[in-house]
From Swiss-Prot:
UniProt KW Secreted keyword: yes
Top-rank taxon, per record: Eukaryota
UniProt protein name: Pi-phymatoxin-Pcf1a
Summary of the function given for this chain in its UniProt record: Reversibly inhibits acid-sensing ion channels (ASIC) in rat dorsal root ganglia neurons (IC(50)=100 nM). Reversibly inhibits voltage-gated potassium channels (Kv) in rat DRG neurons (IC(50)=3.5 uM).
Cystine pairs: C1-C15, C8-C20, C14-C28
Chief localization: secreted
UniProt-annotated location(s): Secreted; Nematocyst
Keywords assigned: Disulfide bond, Ion channel impairing toxin, Nematocyst, Neurotoxin, Proton-gated sodium channel impairing toxin, Secreted, Toxin
Length: 32
C-alpha cells in the first residue's frame, strides 16, 4: 500500500485507512 505523501489513485491504495486526495495529483494523507 502507499504511505502518507505517496501518490495514489483511490483510497484503497493507501495504508491504514488513509484518504486519497489532492489538487495536483492525489496523495495519501491522514484525515483529521
Amino acid at each position: 500500500c502507499a504511505s502518507q505523501g505517496q501518490k495514489c489513485k483511490t483510497k484503497s491504495d493507501c495504508c491504514n485507512g488513509m484518504w486519497c486526495a489532492g489538487t495536483r495529483g492525489h496523495t495519501c494523507y491522514k484525515p483529521k
